Structures are given as C-alpha cells and as structure tokens.
C-alpha cells in the first residue's frame, strides 16, 4: 500500500546484511534463526544486541545498522515492516531518505532499551504499552488483561525506538 510495507528477509548461514542507514522506520520480527544487530550513530555510539526466534525490535531512524546471522548452518529469516512507501511518495527524494544528516538521539532511548529493558505505560485495558527498542521473545512477555475483549484475553502494544509504527501482541481465548 501507500503507507507501510512488509518484506521478508533471509540472511544465509554465517551471512550478514548490507550496512544500511535511512530515515524511514523499520520494525523487525524474527521468524527463524538467531543472530545479532549492530547499530551505530553518527557520533560513534554503538549498540549491539542478540536476537532469536520471536524477537521484536526497531532500528532507530537514521542510524547505521547491520544484521548478522549467528548460525553457520541455518538461515535467519525475519519480517520487516517499514513506512518507506509513505516517505518516498511524500518526498520523492532518495538522497533525503538514505543520506540525510539529521540525527534523532531521542529515538535511541536509554542504553538498557537495547537489552530488553523498558518502561510500562499503563493506560487502559487494550492500550497498555511497553516502550523499548528490543524484546527478546514476545511469546514469553507478560501481556496485560483485556477482559472487554473476552474472558482470559490479554494484549500489549509495543512502542519501539520511540517510533510511530504501531504493533501489538494479543492473546484472545477461543470462542470469545
């Protein structure tokens, strides 16, 4: 569509992605495999973290990053949701998107956000949020009760790298 896109990427065994830097948001869900990502800001700050199946993370906008497959035997596969279509259609300028000198230090958050630390933002059922940059395994993260969605249902919204791409995890009991 014209706003967001989703791509599936595969990094071969022992492989790595090209280094990238762009102004669009990028949320990554790891479907298979394990590895690491290194992020570097223009002032030389580096952050690295390891991910595996069911990890969820966002690369802070306009930082350099590279993904590495930690297995020499199996590929790593992940889905990447981006707002690239909206930005390229708005600005129609690849130089602006891929070579923009603007920095966004507020998108980095505290250093612990790259290690899975974060902040719970209690709003109302169905709207509770966890703010971080990285979640090691969304299937083992405590969701918040959402009784209005059905008995036993729960949900949690993710704010990743202070971004605007909304995502959530919900557990809805069968038959509700």
Task: Say what each PLM segment does.
Residues 68-70:
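Asparagine-centered strand-capping/turn motif at beta-strand->loop junctions
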Residues 12-13, 22-42, 173-176:
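Glycine- and acidic-residue-biased ligand/ion/polar-headgroup-sensing regions
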Residues 5-22, 151-155, 165-176:
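Conserved short histidine dyad/triad with adjacent acidic residue
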Residues 1-2, 95-169:
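A short, N-terminal "cap"/entry segment at the start of jelly-roll beta-barrel domains
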Residues 27-29, 58, 73-93:
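A short hydrophobic beta-strand segment most commonly corresponding to one strand
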Residues 23, 63-64, 84:
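A generic "binding-loop/recognition-motif" signal
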Residues 41-62:
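Short acidic-glycine-tyrosine-enriched beta hairpin
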């Amino acid at each position: 569509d014209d706003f967001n896109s989703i791509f599936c990427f595969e990094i071969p065994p022992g492989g790595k992605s090209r280094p990238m830097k762009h102004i669009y948001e990028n949320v990554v869900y790891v479907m298979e495999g394990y590895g690491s990502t290194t992020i570097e800001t223009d002032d030389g700050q580096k952050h690295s973290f390891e991910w595996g199946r069911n990890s969820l993370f966002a690369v802070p906008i306009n930082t350099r990053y590279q993904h590495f497959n930690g297995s020499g035997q199996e590929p790593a596969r992940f889905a990447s949701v981006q707002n690239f279509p909206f930005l390229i259609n708005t600005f129609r300028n690849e130089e602006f998107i891929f070579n923009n000198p603007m920095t966004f230090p507020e998108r980095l958050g505290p250093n612990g956000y790259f290690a899975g630390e974060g902040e719970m933002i209690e709003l109302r059922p169905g709207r509770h949020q966890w703010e971080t940059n990285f979640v090691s395994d969304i299937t083992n993260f405590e969701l918040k009760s959402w009784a209005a969605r059905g008995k036993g249902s729960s949900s949690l919204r993710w704010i990743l790298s202070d971004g605007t791409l909304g995502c959530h995890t919900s557990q809805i009991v069968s038959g509700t």
